[in-house]
């Protein structure tokens, strides 16, 4: 079953958290669910070059809280936070409610090459530039190994290198335990639009195991942070508190 099911959905509540945190009645649930879809779609299209890994949504009364995990926070924040105001107005327009309070927090991804979605996005960009898929996979593996991941699996399917018959090929380095529920496995799915058709890209990243009564992952054998390295940036939106 571990090889068939989505690794993120299998580990919800164990090592993975829900991407949307809110409760609603049976009448308002589909409306809020559609809002979440529109918000994520709008952000991914508007900031396709910002390297957004994930968008977490939380709702408290009439307030909407967003947490954007990105590799380039400066693209979203802008000069003196001007990009946040533009993003807030765009979200309000997308959901059709100009009076909705929207709070946005931008968090920089600490290890870009250890993030499954950013790795999949990198592979998709290289394939769209018509780089050979085997070379692209090898480069992605090297980047992930330098980031200190414990295991990585990459699968690419479609008309590889313009072949007439579609096929899928995969490669794995290290250990990727899909059946172990306490294993923190980051999973991502992306598509690359090439001249020969659409290629599907799947990436599994094994970061470590979460032991009982331990909240943080213990990555055995992972590469430690170098001394003097830059800490990840975080921009917290405080405009809603000041206005209220």
Curated annotation (Swiss-Prot):
Organism of derivation: Prochlorococcus marinus (strain MIT 9515)
Domain KH type-2 as annotated: residue spans: 39-110
Example of a GO biological process term: translation
Name of protein: Small ribosomal subunit protein uS3
SUPFAM superfamilies named in the record: Prokaryotic type KH domain (KH-domain type II) (SSF54814), Ribosomal protein S3 C-terminal domain (SSF54821)
Region (Disordered), start-end ranges: 221-244
Recorded superkingdom: Bacteria
Function: Binds the lower part of the 30S subunit head. Binds mRNA in the 70S ribosome, positioning it for translation.
């Amino acid at each position: 079953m571990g090889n068939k099911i989505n690794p993120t959905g299998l580990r919800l509540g164990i090592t993975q958290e829900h991407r949307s945190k809110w409760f609603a009645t049976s009448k308002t649930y589909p409306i809020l669910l559609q809002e979440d879809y529109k918000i994520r779609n709008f952000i991914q299209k508007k900031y396709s070059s910002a390297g957004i890994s994930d968008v977490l949504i939380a709702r408290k009364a009439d307030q909407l809280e967003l947490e954007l995990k990105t590799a380039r926070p400066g693209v979203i924040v802008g000069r003196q936070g001007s990009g946040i105001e533009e993003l807030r107005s765009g979200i309000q327009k997308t959901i059709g409610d100009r009076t909705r309070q929207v709070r946005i927090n931008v968090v920089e991804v600490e290890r870009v090459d250890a993030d499954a979605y950013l790795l999949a996005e990198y592979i998709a960009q290289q394939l769209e530039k018509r780089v050979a898929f085997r070379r692209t996979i090898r480069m992605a593996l090297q980047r992930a190994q330098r980031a200190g991941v414990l295991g990585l699996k990459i699968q690419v399917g479609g008309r590889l290198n313009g072949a007439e018959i579609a096929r899928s090929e995969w490669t794995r380095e290290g250990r990727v335990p899909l059946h172990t529920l306490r294993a923190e496995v980051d999973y991502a799915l992306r598509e690359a639009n090439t001249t020969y058709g659409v290629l599907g890209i799947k990436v599994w990243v094994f970061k470590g195991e979460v032991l009982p009564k331990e909240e943080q992952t213990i990555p055995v054998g992972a590469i430690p942070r170098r001394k003097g390295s830059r800490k990840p940036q975080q921009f917290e939106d405080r405009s809603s508190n000041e206005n209220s």
